[in-house]
Amino acid sequence: MKNLTGIFSALLVAFNEDGSINEQGLRQIIRHNIDKMKVDGLYVGGSTGENFMLSTAEKKEIFRIAKDEAKDQIALIAQVGSVNLQEAVELGKYATELGYDCLSAVTPFYYKFSFAEIKHYYDTIIAETGNNMIVYSIPFLTGVNIGVEQFGELYKNPKILGVKFTAGDFYLLERLKKAYPNHLIWAGFDEMMLPAVALGVDGAIGSTFNVNAPRARQIFELTKQGKLAEALAVQHVTNDLIEGILANGLYLTIKELLKLQGVEAGYCREPMTAKATDKQLEVAKALYAKFL
């Protein structure tokens, strides 16, 4: 297994206008991340990949393309989580057979599952696949909050390496790192990377890293070195960019920024708005000129 610390892009997926996967575009996004953004790895099949609007077959196809293009150049994490446990197991087995370095799974959502049910979900995926696991905690979208003691229960399974922490509760983040120093934490909010690194996270997984990974690495390394004023200056610039991206439409804007760099980033998947408006295109061009 490759080193799983550092800067990981949450991989965007290029779609054609009819909603099908644009394989050529997806390969270009992967190459851009490896060759230009110099990321340490890719987090494939997450929210940024518009994953929860895709069929099982489409999710497998994205895993296949990503592994085929990246090969062994960087670390690959496959997000296989689903409210359908059988699908999660099927995807986990497939990604493991492809040679993914680790699995990740979002906490099961929509229904108010008990913690015992959530623990069973992770233990089942691990038992069926034999692969290592990263818990994907994103409570503002799932409504699932896992506490310090509950993480301790999850961590009794030695295959669970840590958590992708996409939450603003930095008290919980600090408590987790103190309680379980041997378990890894990946920051999931790009705009709060500096304080997360100051609290000891081991890496970061972000959507904006598809276009802004060099700055993310600067923040990560400068903060680790204790150069907080310098890191904060880079975080300010990063957050100015993120503010513009969020106001203009997150995934559409990142895809337009990639297109301005010659990457065939394609469309978004409906029911998201598939195509940027003229106004959104103008904003993307302005962001590109100012920040990239």
Swiss-Prot record:
The active site is at Y136 (proton donor), K164 (schiff-base intermediate with substrate). GO terms for cellular component: cytosol. Its EC number is 4.1.3.3. SMART domains: DHDPS (SM01130). It is found in: Cytoplasm. Keywords: Carbohydrate metabolism, Cytoplasm, Lyase, Schiff base. Homotetramer. Catalyzes the reversible aldol cleavage of N-acetylneuraminic acid (sialic acid; Neu5Ac) to form pyruvate and N-acetylmannosamine (ManNAc) via a Schiff base intermediate. PANTHER family: N-ACETYLNEURAMINATE LYASE. This is N-acetylneuraminate lyase. The lineage of its organism: Bacteria, Pseudomonadati, Pseudomonadota, Gammaproteobacteria, Pasteurellales.
